[in-house]
Curated annotation (Swiss-Prot):
Cofactor names: Mg(2+)
Catalytically driven reaction(s): IMP + L-aspartate + GTP = N(6)-(1,2-dicarboxyethyl)-AMP + GDP + phosphate + 2 H(+)
Annotated positions binding IMP: D13, E14, G15, K16, N38, A39, G40, H41, T130, R144, Q224, T239, R303
PROSITE patterns in alphabetical order: ADENYLOSUCCIN_SYN_1, ADENYLOSUCCIN_SYN_2
GO molecular function, one term: adenylosuccinate synthase activity
Protein family per UniProt: Belongs to the adenylosuccinate synthetase family.
Name of the protein this chain belongs to: Adenylosuccinate synthetase
Species in which this protein is naturally found: Parvibaculum lavamentivorans (strain DS-1 / DSM 13023 / NCIMB 13966)
Gene name of this polypeptide: purA
InterPro entries: Adenylosuccin_syn_GTP-bd (IPR018220), Adenylosuccin_syn_Lys_AS (IPR033128), Adenylosuccinate_synth_dom1 (IPR042109), Adenylosuccinate_synth_dom2 (IPR042110), Adenylosuccinate_synth_dom3 (IPR042111), Adenylosuccinate_synthetase (IPR001114), P-loop_NTPase (IPR027417)
Subunit text: Homodimer.
Functional summary from the UniProt entry: Plays an important role in the de novo pathway of purine nucleotide biosynthesis. Catalyzes the first committed step in the biosynthesis of AMP from IMP.
């Protein structure tokens, strides 16, 4: 029995929600280990649609323990709203099925304001954030001035801690000609929301240690994608946390040996939302067709996603930096009906072939994709549940992807329905 970490291998939106839901049915514990409520995913269970941004996917399944780890940044008001929303659909969220790490950092209104101000500025690089305060909250964590979940349990020291936080933020606000903030209203707002959060607080490292000792299956649920990792992604057009599988250990309080299989969720083509380099982006009718067929709109923001052909160079790099054991290839059915399908096999920069995405922003902007063209297929792959149901050209495409990215396809998804999945390798099995 192996514990499993699920991460995206592209720029997010790879279809992690369906795969995590498929795996969570067999897991005992589901853990979010990074990010915040900027990572939306949609689940459809028994005809009911759930749109989650913060809570782990396991929360909608009875008998599962869900955990928000210390690597998560938690907006307590967004948390309460999401709990209420799924409660209205019959899902009970209690301290028995959800634990929040006591050392997780809180997102405050001041973080959201700073995020919005930066994105709205006329100068500088626009990152394309969700403006939900994720980045500024991580900044305060690194600066050792953040308010953490456990601080809600001690109102007597909350004022001093908020004042320390505001000493930094008010300096920023003065520089941007914004009104300075007083600690009082923030402290009162935190005291008011605290009862919605504190019942769930626990030393989750200890909870996970007990789960391991009992031999329970643990599923670590990543958000965003490897190419949005603050270190390994297309910096500065990245998120503010580490999204690679290595963060599953540090972001939840377990050792790296607790993770047995890393499943990289990989879309059969490529999409990106927001700003940043995108070597295989298609702005023609082919890109539009991919977007329409794949319903490529963000769960959190509703923004239209940019679309392009599969980038094997980028995914291969993500597999190596992300420690990915095998991939789940999703949305293969979106490619149905194309006469030909292109795959990026290498890059060219200033006339030289390159086998990886360079770290520098200027070099990334110069990348030209080199394509291999494959025969498409007319027969539908939608709903296929075995290799025998796939057109020969589709099988050839999958095998070619495996060869290029140097990793096996462990699962193949052929529709948004959870049962339309072809299993080659069970990630939970040693």
């Amino acid at each position: 029995m192996a514990n499993v970490a699920v991460v995206g291998s592209q720029w997010g939106d790879e279809g992690k929600g369906k795969i995590v839901d498929w795996l969570s049915e067999r897991a005992d514990v589901v853990v979010r280990f990074q990010g915040g409520h900027n990572a939306g995913h949609t689940l459809v269970i028994d005809g009911v649609t759930y749109k989650l941004s913060l809570l782990p996917s396991g929360i909608v399944r009875k008998g599962k323990l869900s955990i928000l780890g210390n690597g998560v940044v938690l907006d307590p008001w967004a948390f309460a709203k999401e709990v209420d929303e799924i409660a209205s659909k019959g899902v009970a969220v209690t301290p028995d099925n959800l634990k929040i790490a006591e050392n997780a950092v809180l997102i405050l209104p001041v973080h959201r304001e700073l995020d919005e101000m930066r994105e709205g500025a006329n100068s500088g690089v626009k990152i394309g954030t969700t403006k939900r305060g994720i980045g500024p909250a991580y900044e305060d964590k690194a600066g050792r001035r953040a308010i953490r979940v456990i601080d809600l349990a001690d109102p007597s020291t909350l004022t001093i801690k908020v004042e320390g936080l505001l000493a930094h933020h008010n300096a920023l606000r003065r520089g941007n000609r914004l009104e300075e903030l007083e600690a009082g209203p923030i402290v009162e707002a935190l005291k008011e929301i605290a009862p919605r959060v504190l019942p769930f607080v626990a030393p989750v490292w200890n909870v996970l240690d007990e789960a391991k000792r009992k031999g329970q299956r643990i599923l670590f649920e990543g958000a965003q994608g490897t190419m949005l990792d603050v270190d390994h992604g297309t910096y500065p057009f990245v998120t503010s946390s580490n999204t690679v599988a290595g963060q599953a250990a540090g972001g939840s309080g377990v050792g790296p040996g607790a993770i047995g299989f890393v499943l990289g969720i990989t879309k059969a083509y490529t999409t990106r939302v927001g700003e940043g380099p995108f070597p295989t982006e298609l702005t023609d009718e082919v890109g539009q067709r991919l977007g329409e067929r794949g319903h490529e709109f963000g769960t959190v923001t509703g923004r239209k996603r940019r679309c392009g052909w599969f980038d094997a160079v980028m995914v291969r790099q993500a597999i190596k930096t992300g420690g990915i054991t095998g991939i789940a290839l999703t949305k293969l059915d979106v490619l149905d009906g194309f006469d030909e399908i292109k795959v990026c096999t290498s890059y060219e920069i200033d006339g030289k072939l390159v086998d990886h995405l360079p770290a520098g922003m200027d070099a990334q902007a110069k990348v030209t994709p080199i394509y291999e063209t494959l025969e498409g297929w007319k027969d539908s792959t939608q709903g296929a549940r075995s290799w025998a149901q796939l057109p020969a050209a589709a099988v050839k495409y999958v095998r070619y992807v495996e060869e290029l990215i140097e990793a096996p396809v462990a699962l193949l998804s052929t529709s948004p329905e959870r049962d339309d999945t072809i299993l080659m390798k069970d990630p939970f099995e040693d």
